UniProtKB/Swiss-Prot annotation:
<keyword id="KW-0964">Secreted</keyword>
<comment type="similarity">
    <text>Belongs to the neurotoxin 03 (Tx2) family. 03 subfamily.</text>
</comment>
<feature type="disulfide bond">
    <location>
        <begin position="71"/>
        <end position="87"/>
    </location>
</feature>
<feature type="disulfide bond">
    <location>
        <begin position="54"/>
        <end position="72"/>
    </location>
</feature>
<comment type="function">
    <text>No toxicity is observed upon intracranial injection into mice and intrathorax injection into crickets.</text>
</comment>
<keyword id="KW-1015">Disulfide bond</keyword>
<feature type="disulfide bond">
    <location>
        <begin position="69"/>
        <end position="116"/>
    </location>
</feature>
<feature type="signal peptide">
    <location>
        <begin position="1"/>
        <end position="17"/>
    </location>
</feature>
<keyword id="KW-0732">Signal</keyword>
<feature type="disulfide bond">
    <location>
        <begin position="65"/>
        <end position="78"/>
    </location>
</feature>
<feature type="propeptide">
    <location>
        <begin position="18"/>
        <end position="52"/>
    </location>
</feature>
<keyword id="KW-0165">Cleavage on pair of basic residues</keyword>
<keyword id="KW-0960">Knottin</keyword>
<protein>
    <recommendedName>
        <fullName>U13-hexatoxin-Mg1a</fullName>
    </recommendedName>
</protein>
<dbReference type="GO" id="GO:0005576">
    <property type="term" value="C:extracellular region"/>
</dbReference>
């Protein structure tokens, strides 16, 4: 009886002392695969947003422009007159005012795409 109790205690100690890496590795591998998938989706989404916002315009914020349709972005406008314009957003410190400016610029840019070719032909 003492021998069976000793064997049982030794077995329990052996099981408790053995490493449990078999359970942790698949979880780490699964998390790494999920992270890689999320990073790929984020890159694809960023590229899709850039492609969608730059259908016509090819100039980024800070570059010179002639018409707003040259600027890349839904709310980015060509600020300035003639050939001295710069692609940028109109800014205000008021949050509600900024939302209204973004909405106005989006509508103006959308309507401006219809007459963009005519505006650019004047400066060529």
């Amino acid at each position: 009886m003492k021998l069976s109790a000793l064997v049982f205690v030794a077995s329990v100690m052996l099981v408790a002392a053995s490493p449990v890496k078999d359970v942790e590795e698949p979880v780490e591998t699964h998390l790494a695969a999920d992270l890689k998938t999320i990073e790929e989706l984020a890159k694809y989404e960023e590229a899709a947003v850039q492609k969608r916002s730059c259908i016509v315009g090819s100039k980024n914020i800070g570059e010179t422009c002639v018409a707003s349709c040259q600027c890349c972005g839904a709310t980015v406008r060509c600020i300035g007159e003639g050939t001295k314009g710069i692609c940028n957003n109109y800014q205000t410190n008021n949050i509600l005012g900024q939302i209204l400016l973004y909405a106005k610029d989006t509508v103006v840019n959308t309507a401006g795409l219809l007459v963009c070719a005519q505006d650019l032909s004047e400066y060529e």
